[in-house]
């Protein structure tokens, strides 16, 4: 008996802990169900659920009158996702954290008596919130507007996601920790693993770093600072994993041996607390050692406790033949890296649905290739059996909720990795959308029109190391060959532009119209270069460009007025926060700043990188 008792108490204790966790989760889920019922205008307690542990993730919809009981069986870590899979089968949709689509009771009853299996494509699936950019999540997670963060955490759970991380910064650090506590507590209760994104020695964009720059470069006190700041973070925040930059910036490396040492120390320190380290593996170039090779792939030599986040940028993916970003031909080397390391350590693929830096939602351009490329990458990686899919996002306004939602939906194997999963659920005309996707893929991506209709940033204009391969406006102005080539390509694309008037969602339709108007605007800007500075012909061409801009502005005004879901975050305003930027993430989109800048540059023939520049380069660096 004395040998049995310890095992009895051990089992009882573990069982009691699991029961308490379930009771806590049950209360939170009931609260969320009440919130969903209220929004749907259903009677209270129309929805209920029961849970039992099992090896297969299933949910059975049992109905009694107008009441629905979701009978959930699953492995423990999929209980929340399996439950919300039941709501999905009833017809509840959550395209955006502040947008719920509810079924009628009659439609929901079509699921009665049926059993559905939840089949996730990846064990871990979720989003990195890039709060180094001045988006809604800066206010929500880091600056105390907790309702924004709580809505987002619920959106993750409702869309069957189970990982999230947030970039933390140096300014007002204590306030950030306080602001993170409530949403991180809710995420934990819902079974969502929570991470913090930071740098070992990252200097750019106010990022929090574990080692001060001097110590990182000199090696003096680097390990002491590293351990001290890991402890500081652990003492102030309950989190599950850390994602770490290993260079001083995305484009500049630190000493290779030191960097390996920092990774190994960090992984070991985190492991003591039951936490996990992942390192970001960028696609930037020109960081190569004869001994160690590509600095971005250096973590392959670290302890196997160090996980990987292989990154791709913008609307390019692992299987694209051409990905002219950061001096690359494509990202085939990143796919090879994944395949070589997959059996050795944890890997979460780390792509994007919004780049933000003058390229997509802040232009604004609604780039539908994000739907195509993310679906293709997920489908390609599923047979590789990688552990996770971790999508980088810079915000969901200006229609970019569509791309994040499609990624979340495609974590469900039943969706078959379709680029149209979200649009189908929205009841859109799929034939029309296929023509839109095919058109943008051909012209914007394959024929590289994106380099013409997006905008050069400060780095593009002051150096030859371009973010995206492009001709700057100065180069177009100085070369008639370049100018006429770009004019010809724009005219060809405009001639084949599909009619988007049949798009049902107003926000998406307006953004597609704005995107098409940008083609016309870019064309007129280039046509104006054919004529002398003060000629009437140039003035007429620039007037035409202005006219297209004003047409776009009319549509943007409707979007900012009727489809602004975070008014307190002031995303469309000129304002500051703890990031390196002096404006909300969508101020340039709301004002069409970049469009006006191009017109003014031609009018004045002023191509100075700092002309009408809104980014403080020193703030970005320091």
What are these regions (language model features)?
Residues 21, 43, 113, 228-231, ...:
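Substrate-binding groove of N-acetylhexosamine-processing glycoside hydrolases
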Residues 50, 62, 128-130, 245, ...:
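Residues in well-ordered beta-strands of folded domains
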Residues 17-18, 40-54, 96-106, 195-199, ...:
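A generic structural motif
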Residues 3-12:
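Sec-dependent N-terminal signal peptides
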């Amino acid at each position: 008996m004395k040998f049995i008792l310890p095992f009895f108490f051990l089992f009882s204790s573990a069982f009691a802990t699991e029961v308490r966790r379930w009771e806590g989760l049950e209360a939170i889920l009931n609260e969320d169900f009440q919130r969903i019922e209220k929004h749907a205008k259903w009677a209270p307690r129309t929805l209920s659920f029961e849970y039992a542990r099992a090896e297969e993730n299933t949910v059975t919809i049992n109905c009694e009158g107008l009441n629905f009981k979701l009978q959930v069986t699953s492995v423990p870590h999929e209980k929340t996702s399996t439950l919300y899979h039941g709501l999905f089968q009833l017809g509840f949709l959550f395209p955006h954290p502040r947008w719920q689509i509810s079924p009628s009771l009659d439609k929901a009853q079509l699921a009665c008596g049926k059993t559905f299996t939840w089949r996730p494509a990846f064990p871990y699936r979720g989003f990195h919130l890039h709060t180094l950019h001045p988006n809604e999540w800066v206010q929500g997670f880091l600056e105390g507007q907790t309702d924004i963060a709580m809505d987002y955490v619920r959106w993750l759970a409702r869309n069957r996601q189970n990982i999230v991380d947030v970039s933390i910064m140096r300014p007002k650090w204590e306030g950030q920790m306080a602001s993170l506590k409530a949403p991180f507590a809710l995420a934990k209760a819902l079974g969502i693993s929570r991470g913090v994104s930071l740098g070992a020695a990252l200097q750019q964009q106010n990022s929090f770093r574990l080692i001060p720059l001097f110590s990182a470069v000199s090696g003096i006190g680097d390990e002491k600072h590293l351990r001290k700041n890991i402890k500081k973070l652990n003492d102030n925040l309950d989190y599950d994993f850390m994602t770490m930059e290993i260079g001083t910036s995305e484009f500049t490396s630190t000493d290779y041996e030191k960097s390996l040492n920092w990774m190994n120390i960090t992984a070991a320190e985190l492991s003591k607390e039951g936490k996990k380290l992942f390192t970001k593996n960028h696609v930037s170039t020109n960081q190569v050692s004869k001994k160690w090779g590509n600095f971005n792939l250096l973590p392959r030599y670290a302890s196997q406790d160090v996980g990987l986040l292989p990154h791709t940028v913008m609307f390019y993916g692992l299987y694209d033949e051409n990905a002219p970003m950061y001096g690359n031909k494509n990202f085939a080397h990143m796919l090879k890296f994944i395949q070589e390391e997959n059996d050795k350590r944890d890997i979460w693929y780390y792509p994007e649905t919004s780049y933000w830096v003058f390229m997509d939602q802040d232009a604004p351009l609604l780039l539908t290739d994000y739907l195509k490329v993310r679906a293709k990458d997920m489908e390609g990686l599923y047979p590789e059996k990688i552990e996770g899919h971790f999508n980088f996002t810079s915000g969901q306004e200006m229609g970019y909720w569509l791309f994040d939602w499609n990624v979340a939906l495609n974590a469900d194997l039943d969706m078959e990795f379709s680029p149209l999963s979200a649009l189908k659920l929205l009841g859109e005309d799929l034939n029309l959308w296929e023509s839109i996707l095919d058109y943008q893929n051909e012209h914007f991506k394959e024929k590289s029109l994106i380099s013409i209709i997006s905008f050069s940033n400060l780095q593009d204009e002051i150096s030859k190391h371009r973010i995206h391969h492009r001709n700057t406006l100065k180069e177009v102005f100085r070369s008639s060959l370049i100018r006429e080539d770009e004019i010809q390509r724009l005219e060809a694309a405009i001639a084949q532009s599909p009619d988007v008037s049949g798009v049902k969602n107003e926000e998406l339709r307006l953004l597609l119209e704005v995107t098409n108007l940008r083609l016309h605007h870019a064309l007129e800007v280039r046509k104006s270069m054919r004529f002398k500075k003060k000629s009437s012909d140039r003035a007429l061409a620039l007037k035409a460009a202005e006219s297209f801009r004003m047409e776009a502005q009319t549509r943007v005004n409707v979007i900012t007025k009727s489809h602004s879901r975070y008014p307190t975050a002031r995303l469309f305003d000129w304002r500051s926060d703890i990031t390196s930027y002096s404006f909300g993430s969508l101020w340039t989109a709301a004002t069409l700043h970049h469009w006006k800048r191009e017109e003014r540059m031609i009018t004045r023939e002023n191509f100075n990188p700092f002309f009408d520049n809104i980014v403080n380069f020193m703030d970005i660096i320091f």
